[in-house]
């Protein structure tokens, strides 16, 4: 099965199923949240439940061209749109994008939605955005280098990339031992993918959920730097739904900047 599996198509269907299962990251914000955002009282998350520091954002979000990357679900996009941003939500799941469309229709928000693979942002011209907002999602993407390269391309000079990702070290543990007995049994090497498991074991541990990829910190942080970004901030948070929360960070979030355009010296 795994030899012929298309991870993008598989994860598209898997995330559509997560909408049916009411996964917490598929629940749209209520009208009270967007109403407050319209008055300037807003927050969004990249990792866990901790709001992103406001100083990570542009000085004014009003009028900023924002790409909410792999960020469907009717959460971050509507909040930023209500706060005054020009928002495009890009996601691999039609059902997740439908959540954003529902909130936009309900609350009178202008949000553009685009379906696709986060490694291919060819729907957008170079320098289209002031901010790429990418909450935890690249765990479902097979390779990271194209993601960072595309983010760099579609950002304007001095544009911002805010991204969240899982701690790769979470994947060294046997998932069944961790989730059923809260036992830390070291079993896997990183980088790891759930596709590395025999199908029967993968279904026991992950059901028919999305395929996951641990990646590495080199791929996450080093990849951003290799694409040309300058890293300015890094924070961590526990994975509260996981037994590891008592011992290690489960998430990291970074803020990176595309360097301003440099004028050639006067000749």
What spans do the regions from the language model cover?
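A short SAM/SAH-binding and catalytic strip from SAM-dependent methyltransferases
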Residues: 130-145
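A short glycine-rich, Lys/Arg-flanked "PGG" loop and its adjoining helix->strand segment in the class I
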Residues: 145-160
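Conserved class I S-adenosyl-L-methionine
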Residues: 160-200
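A short acidic, Gly/Pro-enriched loop at the edge of an enzyme's catalytic core
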Residues: 119-132
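Class I SAM-dependent methyltransferase SAM/SAH-binding core
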Residues: 64-120
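Core SAM-dependent methyltransferase catalytic element
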Residues: 227-229, 243-267
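Conserved alpha-helix/loop element of class I SAM-dependent methyltransferases that forms part
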Residues: 27-64
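Short alpha-helix
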Residues: 211-234
């Amino acid at each position: 099965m795994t030899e012929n599996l298309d991870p993008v198509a598989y994860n598209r269907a898997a995330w559509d199923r997560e909408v049916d299962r009411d996964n917490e990251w598929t629940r749209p914000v209520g009208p009270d949240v967007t109403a407050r955002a319209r008055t300037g009282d807003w927050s969004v998350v990249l990792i866990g439940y901790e709001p992103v520091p406001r100083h990570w954002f542009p000085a004014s979000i009003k009028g900023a061209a924002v790409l909410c990357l792999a960020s469907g679900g009717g959460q971050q996009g509507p909040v930023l749109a209500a706060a005054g941003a020009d928002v495009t939500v890009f996601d691999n799941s039609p059902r997740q994008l439908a959540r954003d469309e529902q909130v936009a229709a309900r609350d009178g928000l202008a949000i553009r939605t685009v379906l696709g693979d986060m490694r291919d942002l060819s729907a957008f011209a170079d320098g289209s955005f002031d901010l790429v907002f990418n909450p935890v999602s690249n765990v479902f993407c097979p390779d990271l280098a194209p993601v960072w390269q595309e983010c760099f391309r579609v950002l304007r000079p001095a544009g911002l990339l805010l991204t969240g990702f899982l701690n790769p070290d979470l994947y060294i543990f046997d998932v069944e031992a961790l989730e059923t007995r809260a036992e830390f049994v070291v079993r896997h090497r990183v980088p790891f993918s759930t596709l590395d498991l025999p199908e029967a074991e993968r279904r026991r541990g992950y059901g028919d959920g999305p395929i996951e990829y641990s990646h590495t910190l080199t791929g996450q942080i080093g990849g951003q730097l290799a694409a040309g970004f300058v890293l300015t901030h890094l924070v961590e948070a526990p994975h509260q739904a996981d037994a590891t929360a008592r011992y290690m960070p489960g998430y990291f979030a970074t803020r990176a900047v595309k360097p301003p355009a440099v004028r050639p010296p006067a000749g």
